[in-house]
Each structure stands twice: as C-alpha cells, then as structure tokens.
Amino acid sequence: MPTPQHPPFDPDASLEELAGVGKNRRFDEIIDDEEFEDIQVICKRGEEVIPLAKPSRAFYFGDRNLYDQEAKRFDQEEKARILNTDQFPRNLARFDELKRSCQRGFVIPFVGAGMSKSAGCPEWREYLLNLCDDANLDRDVMRVRLEENSDYEGVMHDLVTALGVNRFNLDFERDFKTPDDIEGAVTLLPKLFDSSVITTNFDRVLEKVYENDATSFVEKVTGRGQAGAFFRAIPAGDRYLLKLHGNLDNAAERVLNKAEYDAAYGNDGNIHFDFPLPKLLKRLFTSYSFLFLGCSLSADRTIQTFMRVAQLEGQENLPHHYALLACPTDAAKKAAIDQRLADAHITPLWYPEGEHGYVEQMLGLLLD
C-alpha cells in the first residue's frame, strides 16, 4: 500500500528518478539554491566558475557515497533545528515515537482552532474579544476570563446571550467563510492522515482541504449525532470527519453555549460518562492515539474529560497521545500545562511561543 515513505510506482519516472534522485528533496533544494553558501557544488575551468543547471544531480552522480553522507548530516541538523532540541531535548525521542505510530496508522489527528487560523480564518480568542463591543460587554474583563481562566465556554455563553443566536450564527458564517486559497500546516493533513479526523471546529476548512486534495470525506458525523459510524470507519480505513461539537447551523447537535455544553457533558461541574460526549471521547481516547493540532488544551471540558478518563482507566492502560504546543515563556504557566497534560496522559512536543510556523515544519518531518 503506498505511503508517504513508500510512494506508488510512477511509470513516467526517469531513470535518474528511479535511481534515487530526488529522494532528499530539501537537501537538493539547498544545494541548488545559489544564495546558500554552506554547501556548494561547483565546476571550474581554471579560475572560471561554470554554472551548473542542477548542482544536486552533479553531486548525486559524481560521488554517491559523499552525497548520502552529506544528505544524512543535513537531515539530522534540520531535524534538530525544527524540533528545537537545544531548547527542548525531549522533543527528539517523543517525535520519533510519534512518527513510528503515524507510519503504522495508529494516530488520529484531533484538530483545533489554531489550524484554521493558519489557513486564514480569524484567531478564536481575538474573534470572541472583537465581538465584545457589539455585545456591550467589557473587553478587558473578557480578556482576563479567557487568558487567565480559560473560560471560553462562559465567555461564549455571554456573547451568544447578548447578541442572540441568530445574529451570532449569521456573522460567524461570514467571518469564517472558508478561504479559496488555503495555505499553511492544515494542507499537509490529507497527506499524513488519509483516514478519519476529529475536530472541535465549526468552520469548514478541513472539508475544503481534503476536497482540494481529491480525498474528500466520505461522511461527516457529529458528537451529539450518530457517532457510531465513526467507530466503524476507523478500522475500515474510511475517510470520516467527526465534528465533535457539531455544526453551527444545527442547534440540536451543536455544542456552543453553556446550555449545550451542559446537555453534552453534564451540568453539575462533573464529567458524566453516560452523557454523549464524555461517553464518545472515553471510547476513542482509550482505543486510539491522538495528535492534538491547533489545540490550546486549556482547562475546558474536553481536556477535563481526558483527565478523568486517565484517572479512571489508569495511564498504563491508555495508548500514548501527543500534542504540538507553543511553550509559554512564563515558567509557572508552562508548569501548569505540563501537569495538566501529564494528568491527561498527553505528551507535548514543544516549539517556541508565537512561532507557529514550526507546526507545519514538524508535520513535514512526519511526511519524510
């Protein structure tokens, strides 16, 4: 079966390509870049430098052993740079473990709002804060609730109550209209995960990305809908999208305001596993490895559910879960996140705060 590591045979490939030319794409691009001076392949006649159309090919066919050595060295240095191993030394072993799981098809991506932002949609926190003026709510107070208390559920409830559901829905559909040209890390997902995907997002970025890649989802299900089909799709390798919190235009299956969160998770401050979403998440979390992408993993009901599952089941009985996360510069905040993730049996791969381009680069490493 073709995979990113073992692509399908190309009957139109040249002899050079069949021989292995092009297998080190990033290394070849560096060698062929005239402005990159660390590695140069040159041809000289006396003191005159004769330009080469493809220095990488000259290197490859000129000294295959040296080419392979330098390509391997480049890959190792590039991997260390992307994983920021100087700052986060545990990233290397964690990444290698994650990559093995991805190659074996054991990982399901769990996609949050950050991935839609990389595609051109508004950032979720700033979007909510920008609604405060229209809702006559104190923006500074709401910012504290979001940044200090991670009270997205409560802020959302107050905004929807003040604006009215119909107005909120209409504005959301316009503000989060899927861009025609989607770029960023999210575009790599169809190549990495050609099967089932989970998201808490209301937008339709994932649907568009998979459609653009000619790998459209066979079906979409929601967390409060008929989610049983999603479990059958995973072992079958069918391409299903689980929109955990539903679609914005379907109030019966949506999880948006406090009343809907209570109906989905329970309303007394506890996680109830006889309620739809905790029951669904428990079954998934105990059966498959997740890779959290674009998720803040703040102390909301979803992460609380995972923490409760880990407590009830015992971490030794759970598959490994992973997250690509920006590392807070504040030591106390990082310690709090570390503890929350440990309690939920989620292993972070950190990158520097604010430098979200590393997510795309890490996903690129998984493809190599």
Feature-to-residue mapping (PLM):
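Short, compositionally biased "basic patch" segments
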Residues: 57-69, 135-160, 234-253
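SIR2/sirtuin-family catalytic core signature
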Residues: 1-105, 117, 159, 163-165, ...
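A short secondary-structure junction signal
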Residues: 208-212, 252-259, 302-306
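Adenosine ribonucleotide-centric catalytic and binding domains
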Residues: 103-154, 209-225
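Short hydrophobic beta-strand that contains or immediately precedes a catalytic carboxylate
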Residues: 108-111, 199, 292-293
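Active-site gating loop/helix substructures
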Residues: 216-285
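Short, solvent-exposed loop/turn segments at secondary-structure junctions
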Residues: 114-117, 203-205, 247-250, 296-298, ...
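Metabolite-binding pocket within alpha/beta catalytic cores that recognizes anionic/polar moieties
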Residues: 83, 90-92, 97-103, 107, ...
